[in-house]
Amino acid sequence: EMKDQEKTENMEEPRIDKTIYTGRPENMEGRLEKEIAVYDFLDSLGIEYKRVDHEALMTMEACEEVDHLLEAKICKNLFLCNRQKTDFYLLLMPGEKPFKTKFLSKQIGTARLSFADGEQMEEYLNITPGSLSLMGLIFDKEKKVHLVIDKEVLDEEYFGCHPCINTSTLLMKTSDVKEKILPALGHEYQVVELPTE
């Protein structure tokens, strides 16, 4: 009986603190260095953001509850590479859009795109799978990762992402991303239009 109970408990949705906080956590205890680096980066740019804390979110479905709480859609982040594993791409796209390689390959001029592995994600972005975020680019000092953004993400009023760890989600104005964050990161980026079907 206990085993069955454990099973159902493990199947439960991640616990989400329903409080919407403003800015960085007051208490940094237990927060990772890379997460704190994200708050420092945002604060240095004078960016206002909302924050929700939660257990690790591993699926887009789990993210939906956070989206609902923040009243915004958090985009899907994909870490891709070419076949030779010499070019790496961080793609930000709407969560509900299906990812179809051929449309992206055509627009960015790279054939045979595939998902890069977790080791490379850690090496270049200091992030482990499940926590992928635009904010990882603060660790890509050598600008090895190409940033690719679906136009729809930039057209949204708000932009949501993890602070390099999937136990918090941040929400900020997309205009701040375009006018302050992207210039501060210094990564050139390409805007693409991916099909909804």
Where are these regions (language model features)?
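Extended, low-hydrophobicity, polar/charged segments
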Residues: 3-197
